[in-house]
Amino acid sequence: MACARGTVAPPVRASIDVSLVVVVHGGGASNISANRKELVREGIARAATEGYKILKAGGSAVDAVEGAVTVLENDPEFNAGYGSVLNVNGDIEMDASIMDGKDLSAGAVSAVRCIANPVKLARLVMEKTPHCFLTGHGAEKFAEDMGIPQVPVEKLITERTKKHLEKEKLEKGAQNADCPKNSGTVGAVALDCRGNLAYATSTGGIVNKMVGRVGDSPCIGAGGYADNNLGAVSTTGHGESILKVNLARLALFHVEQGKTVEEAAQLALDYMKSKLKGLGGLILVNKTGDWVAKWTSASMPWAAVKNGKLQAGIDLCETRTRDLPC
């Protein structure tokens, strides 16, 4: 397959049978340093494999995206959960969301501090409350009520994120977040054997952000969207730009208009870039299992599993493929 700029998609399907599909991303960002690339590649492949295992075992699309994103939240190479970037005060504030395309159920949390896996809390918001979104202290109180253990913030902070904040302060000055060099987010989309779709997105946000800043990741329609009639999307990139164009739902609008997944992703990202100069990326799977990973940022770690075949990459036209054990 020829590789266009920032685009990865599988070969054309041979049939319209529902296939199990998981696609994950590790965030649209500036170029990843050579000494981290293999760790990032391994982490993203591990997450996709975990999501696919859940589907193979009969789990739902929601189970799969939660499982895949949890793997990435637990990996310090990614900006979510353990290893989240720090705000202007050197603290962690994390956001996450999840959505079930079967009935449009959704849950989200923002500005949570002492939770190792915000995606799990977002799912509990979806399933255990009448609400879609909890934030800050309210979200943390809900986590306590649900029996989710609190984790001291210092245990979620890494030496790399401390150095990242110091470097950002020196280079840009506090609060200057117009065009962050690292807009790392993690996300997953999945299609299960019952034809249900889901997405999940999780992030630590933008390094050196103002206290209380919330980006696109927990916002349904911006950070992600899932509808069984259309597809599932998880986005990454400059959060303020993604919010302004409602990037996830915009991509699915183009699917609704009859565009292929690749065309839909390209149109949505091009609009954000032309209108706002906003860079980013997205992963999308439609109701028949066609998927795409597309980005306008310098790189976007991604991995996908379909029909037992794992594909993964980071940079343009750099894809590794292997068969998973049966």
UniProtKB/Swiss-Prot annotation:
It comes from the Eukaryota. It catalyses: L-asparagine + H2O = L-aspartate + NH4(+); Cleavage of a beta-linked Asp residue from the N-terminus of a polypeptide. The active site is at residue 185. Substrate binds at residues 213-216, 236-239. Keywords: Autocatalytic cleavage, Cytoplasm, Hydrolase, Protease. It is found in: Cytoplasm. InterPro entries: ASRGL1_meta (IPR033844), Ntn_hydrolases_N (IPR029055), Peptidase_T2 (IPR000246). Cleaved into an alpha and beta chain by autocatalysis; this activates the enzyme. The N-terminal residue of the beta subunit is responsible for the nucleophile hydrolase activity. GO terms for cellular component: cytoplasm; photoreceptor inner segment. High expression in the heart and brain while low to minimal expression in the other tissues. In ocular tissues, high levels is observed in the optic nerve and retina while relatively low levels of expression are detected in the iris-ciliary body, lens or retinal pigment epithelium. One of its GO terms (molecular function) is beta-aspartyl-peptidase activity. Has both L-asparaginase and beta-aspartyl peptidase activity. May be involved in the production of L-aspartate, which can act as an excitatory neurotransmitter in some brain regions. Is highly active with L-Asp beta-methyl ester. Besides, has catalytic activity toward beta-aspartyl dipeptides and their methyl esters, including beta-L-Asp-L-Phe, beta-L-Asp-L-Phe methyl ester (aspartame), beta-L-Asp-L-Ala, beta-L-Asp-L-Leu and beta-L-Asp-L-Lys. Does not have aspartylglucosaminidase activity and is inactive toward GlcNAc-L-Asn. Likewise, has no activity toward glutamine. Heterodimer of an alpha and beta chain produced by autocleavage. This heterodimer may then dimerize in turn, giving rise to a heterotetramer. Belongs to the Ntn-hydrolase family. This is Isoaspartyl peptidase/L-asparaginase. It comes from Mus musculus. The lineage of its organism: Eukaryota, Metazoa, Chordata, Craniata, Vertebrata. The gene is Asrgl1.
